[in-house]
Structure formats: C-alpha cells, structure tokens
Amino acid sequence: MRRRDMCRFIIIKSQNEIHPEDILHRFAAMARRSRSPDGDRQSDGWGISWLSNDMKWQVHKSINPIWDESHTFSSFSKSRFIVAHARSAFSKNDKKVLAHNQPFYRGAYAFVFNGLLRGVSFSSPIAGDIGSQKIWTLLQDQLGRFSPNDSLLRLNKMLEKNCREIEGLNIGLCDGINIYAYCRNSMHPEYYNLRFHESSTLKIISSEALDGYDFVPVEIGQVLTSY
C-alpha cells in the first residue's frame, strides 16, 4: 500500500502580526508552477490555518486550486503564525473531498505533510481515510508524550520500520510558539527538499522558494526548529 501526498506547503512565524495576502499570492504562484515527479499539479484544493489572538487555530479550506481563489486572500486575518497547503490528490476517488485538505490541526498544533511512502504496513489500524491523516494520527500520539522535536524523530523511525521505501517525507508543524520541519527523501531532491528563509522578523519553511525571498535547504534527516 502507498501513502502519497504530492503537495506544496508553507509555515510562517513572524515577529509581528502580518496579513497573509502577499505571501499567499507568492505561494499560489509557486504551487501553480510546480509539478510533482510524475507530472501532477497541486490543483486538488488548498487550505490555510492561522493562529488567532486567543491562541486558537482558524481554518479555511477549498476544493479549488489555490491560484483560482486569489480573490479570497484579503479576507483572512493578521497573525504571527500561518500555515498553508496546496494539494495533489492520490486518486480520482480522493479528489473534491474537503476534509482531506490540509492543514490539519488539533489543540495547539497545526500540521502539514507531503511525500510518498511505499509498502506501508502496520499491525493495527490507524485512524484516517488517507495517508496524510494517518501520519497525523501517528504524530499526535507521539506529541501527547514527547516534545515536537522528539516526536518527529520518533515518527520517522516508526515509518522506517513499517514502510518498504520512503521516497519522500516532509512534515511541517507549528505549536503557536515555534515552527518545526522534518525532511528526508531517497530520490527527486529538487521536489522533496524543503527550504528555509530567516530574517530578523520573519521565518518561513517552504516546499519551494517563494519569489522575493532568499532560502537555504533544510538539512536532510534532521528536525529544523525555528524559535
């Protein structure tokens, strides 16, 4: 069995509250240009979460391509923490399902994923209809007992044990204090490598570079924690 989610995502931590409109336009342009290794577009919906002043995650999701909904970008609120995701569905039956669009969130955490896992086999059922939901279930279990950094490393070990091959595994996480990323791949590094931008006031984890920002690669096999 394969767990596949060929997607693009960004996670933002800002020193001050910012409006997401400008960065969403850049993200939408990047997602529109991007192609997965098998040629798919990230056109099967998108979502955005932002942390409100009362420390609760707000969310907007759509089954339309993100670049077709630029007229909505001005409607979202300012925030210091923003998470966005543009999706390429695994199968035709998986398209047009709003609940399958990320980000996923629970409690303090917002989560995004992209990657391809081959030969996935666990001894017990895992909650979730699709691969990204199941990975989120596994990560939540770890987050209930360990720090975000340790949870991401433990999740990687768990997937290594229960997958024949991990072609790509990219996870982004935000807890309303810091942002985190884990990145690994066995092929197609130009697609799977995450990027990181850091300035004195803004930090961005992104699937690909955004126009107007300087990025460096995220180290493979390590957790990036941006305080």
Functional labels for PLM-detected ranges:
Residues 1-64, 181-189, 220-226:
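Extreme N-terminus nucleophile/cap motif
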Residues 28-33, 91, 153-155:
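Short Pro/Gly-enriched beta-strand edge/turn motifs at strand-loop
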Residues 33, 61-76, 85-107:
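Short acidic (Asp/Glu) patches
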Residues 37-45, 50-64, 68, 78, ...:
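Domain-scale activation on soluble regions of proteins
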